[in-house]
Each structure stands twice: as structure tokens, then as C-alpha cells.
From Swiss-Prot:
The keyword NADP does not apply. It comes from the Bacteria. Gene3D superfamilies: Peptide methionine sulphoxide reductase MsrA (3.30.1060.10). It comes from Bacillus pumilus (strain SAFR-032). Keywords: Oxidoreductase. One of its GO terms (biological process) is protein modification process. This is Peptide methionine sulfoxide reductase MsrA. It catalyses: L-methionyl-[protein] + [thioredoxin]-disulfide + H2O = L-methionyl-(S)-S-oxide-[protein] + [thioredoxin]-dithiol; [thioredoxin]-disulfide + L-methionine + H2O = L-methionine (S)-S-oxide + [thioredoxin]-dithiol. The gene is msrA. Has an important function as a repair enzyme for proteins that have been inactivated by oxidation. Catalyzes the reversible oxidation-reduction of methionine sulfoxide in proteins to methionine. PANTHER family: PEPTIDE METHIONINE SULFOXIDE REDUCTASE, PEPTIDE METHIONINE SULFOXIDE REDUCTASE MSRA 2. One of its GO terms (molecular function) is peptide-methionine (S)-S-oxide reductase activity. Its EC number is 1.8.4.11. Belongs to the MsrA Met sulfoxide reductase family.
Length: 178
């Protein structure tokens, strides 16, 4: 078994919907919901929701790159979001719900940029990809009740995943491509 561990940080709108797809993959050691990219130290959910902290809801993933490489994380990430929407994701609007790939080193940046370019050229989306690739910033874990929300509140999570429009978007854009 490999001893390697790396971090990947992705903002993809509501973090509730970003945990499950990664959590279920081999080589994923930990998926944590939280906040990143802003100026407020140790923000609360309520503060982030005001769109005044500069933070985005995000997930930070600890993974073994020998089992689940960063390139595969990127592929899975793109399939969870609308990368053409710079105003938020699905039913959630505002700065805190914008997408972003937070890179932890130069190799991640190179892979993220190549992945974004490939997606832009794929023709899957009619509009340009606006997801930003940013340097990793301090990551602040969200409150405990947000962690692994899909396990703690299955019915509400499923209702939200569908009701927000995310599930339908994923189905219409990726069902025959993954």
C-alpha cells in the first residue's frame, strides 16, 4: 500500500453536494467541507453566506495519488459542476458558491490548466469555462453538522441535490460521457 498523500481543494458550489462523489472513490483518504479563498480567519457558515468574507464553500480532499491520481480528481470535479456559470452553482448564487480549483503546487496547476483547456475544447458546453484556477489558500473546516451531510441527512441531501438542479444538470451533460 502506498504511503503518499496529497491535498486537492475544489470549490463547486454547495459543499454538501461535493463530498459524496469523491468520498466513494478508492484512494480517497478524507473529504472535508470548508471555506477557502477569503480574508476572514476561521469564518462561520453564517459569515460566508453573507458574501463578505471572500470565501467559497469548498472541499479539501486528502488522497493517495498512486491509487487515484490528481487527473482523475479533476475529471470527477468537472462532472459535478457547471463550469460556465460564474455567478454560483445551480440554485445557490453569490461569491461563496462560485467554482474554483485551488492548486497546492506547480504540477497541480499544470494539470488543472490542461484539464480546463481540454474541457473547453470538448464541445460539451456552448459557453466558455469560467472556473478559476487559483493558488491554494488557508482552508477552514466547516462546522461539524456540514461534514458528510449526505450521510447524516440522506433525505434532505437527496431532495437538495435534485431540487437545486445539480442532479439534472449532471445527468444531461455527463450521463453518457463518464
Amino acid at each position: 500500500m502506498s504511503e503518499k498523500q496529497e491535498l486537492a481543494t475544489f470549490a463547486g458550489g454547495c459543499f454538501w453536494c461535493m463530498v459524496k462523489p469523491f468520498d466513494e472513490q478508492p484512494g480517497i483518504i478524507k473529504v472535508e467541507s470548508g471555506y477557502t479563498g477569503g480574508h476572514t480567519v476561521n469564518p462561520t457558515y453564517e459569515e460566508v453566506c453573507t458574501n463578505t468574507t471572500g470565501h467559497r464553500e469548498a472541499v479539501q480532499i486528502t488522497f493517495d495519488p498512486d491509487i487515484f491520481p490528481y487527473e482523475k480528481l479533476l475529471e470527477l470535479y468537472w462532472q459535478q459542476i457547471d463550469p460556465t456559470d460564474d455567478g454560483g452553482q445551480f440554485g445557490d448564487r453569490g461569491e461563496s458558491y462560485r467554482t474554483g480549483i485551488y492548486v497546492h503546487h506547480d504540477e497541480q496547476r499544470k494539470l488543472a490548466e490542461a484539464s480546463k483547456e481540454k474541457l473547453n475544447e470538448s464541445g460539451i458546453f456552448q459557453k466558455p469555462i469560467v472556473t478559476e484556477i487559483l493558488d491554494a489558500a488557508p482552508f477552514y473546516p466547516a462546522e461539524e453538522y456540514h461534514q458528510h451531510y449526505y450521510k447524516k441527512n440522506k433525505i434532505h441531501y437527496e431532495r437538495y441535490h435534485v431540487g437545486s438542479g445539480r442532479a439534472g444538470f449532471i445527468e444531461s451533460h455527463w450521463s453518457d460521457k463518464s
